[in-house]
């Protein structure tokens, strides 16, 4: 009943009582038990009994005002979740248990989500492939001899395999976008500050601001539901900001396409070598976008 359903559809089933929260949680837990041993996407997880008890409690204390009410969630193992170690995939951090949640983790829990575990990451969040000495490799969801990308490969694979409805991540140089592309899902690296993080008020120590929380989802509509929960200003992030509109209610009208600008790096001014067929495919798509009045800015950074 729940397989291939969008998050919006699952939320609707919960609200109309066509599916209990326990049923939704069990659906995802069964998929985790079946597929995660080979995918290694979720690397820390609560005891099943504890998760199901949380689901039963939410069924009893139903609150449809909370947008993620009853959805099982897992955060990237670079983000802090109380009760789980934040290991970053690094053996030296295997016993580090945070005393408070990351901001976007708190927001998911406050919105009714059930935090069940942590998703795998490249070691210390650095790398184009998701592998580390603590938990090992997360392979591609479509074949275990291919890469899942990095560093949010656990999240990308978990979302693609329907082990999670959607997932948070972090992105510095493609860490949400690359795993999403490799898993045929959507990945988003927002403007730094849209998704808040605990940062120092010393602006000199924040520059350059490269890394930011991000997210992954199977559809843009699913992602909008998560973004509406985790985006927005926070007093402990000096660069954070809020938007006036809801992501769910935002549509780009035809007349607004001419205002969209895309920066294209290509081979980074000759510093990176890519497969010529890949570059040709991208250039064809850029030509198509330009014909639709989208502005393409061809960038040649000095590296």
Predicted segments, located by residue:
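Acyltransferase
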Residues: 21-25, 56, 248, 274-301
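Flexible, glycine/charged-enriched surface loops at secondary-structure junctions
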Residues: 68, 235-241, 290-302
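An N-terminal boundary/leader segment
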Residues: 1-46, 50-53, 291-293
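A short helix-breaking turn/cap at a secondary-structure junction
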Residues: 189-280
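Enzymes and membrane/adaptor proteins characterized by extended Gly/Ser/Thr/Asp/Glu-rich
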Residues: 35, 67-104
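Short glycine/serine-rich loop segments
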Residues: 101-230
């Amino acid at each position: 009943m729940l397989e291939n359903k969008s998050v919006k559809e699952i939320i609707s089933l919960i609200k109309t009582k066509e599916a209990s929260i326990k049923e939704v949680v069990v659906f995802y837990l069964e998929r985790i038990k079946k597929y995660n041993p080979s995918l290694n996407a979720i690397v820390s997880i609560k005891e099943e009994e504890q998760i199901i008890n949380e689901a039963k409690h939410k069924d009893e204390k139903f609150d449809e005002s909370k947008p993620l009410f009853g959805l099982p969630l897992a955060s990237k193992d670079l983000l802090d979740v109380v009760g789980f170690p934040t290991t970053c995939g690094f053996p030296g951090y295997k016993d580090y248990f945070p005393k408070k949640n990351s901001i976007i983790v708190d927001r998911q829990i406050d919105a009714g989500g059930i935090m069940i575990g942590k998703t795998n990451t490249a070691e210390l969040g650095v790398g184009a492939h998701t592998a580390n000495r603590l938990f090992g490799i997360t392979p591609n969801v479509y074949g275990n001899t291919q890469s899942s990308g990095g560093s949010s490969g656990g999240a990308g694979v978990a979302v693609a395999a329907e082990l999670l409805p959607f997932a948070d991540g972090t992105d510095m140089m493609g860490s949400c976008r690359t795993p999403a592309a490799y898993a045929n899902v959507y990945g988003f690296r927002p403007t730094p500050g849209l998704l808040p993080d605990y940062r120092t008020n010393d602006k000199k120590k924040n520059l350059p601001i490269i890394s930011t929380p991000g997210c992954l989802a199977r559809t843009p509509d699913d992602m909008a539901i998560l973004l509406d929960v985790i985006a927005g200003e926070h007093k402990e992030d000096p660069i954070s900001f809020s938007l006036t509109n809801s992501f769910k209610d935002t549509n780009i009208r035809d007349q607004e396409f001419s205002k969209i600008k895309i920066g294209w790096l290509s081979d980074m001014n000759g510093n990176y070598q890519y497969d010529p067929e890949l570059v040709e495919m991208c250039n064809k798509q850029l030509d198509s976008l330009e014909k639709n009045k989208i502005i393409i800015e061809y960038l040649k950074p000095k590296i």
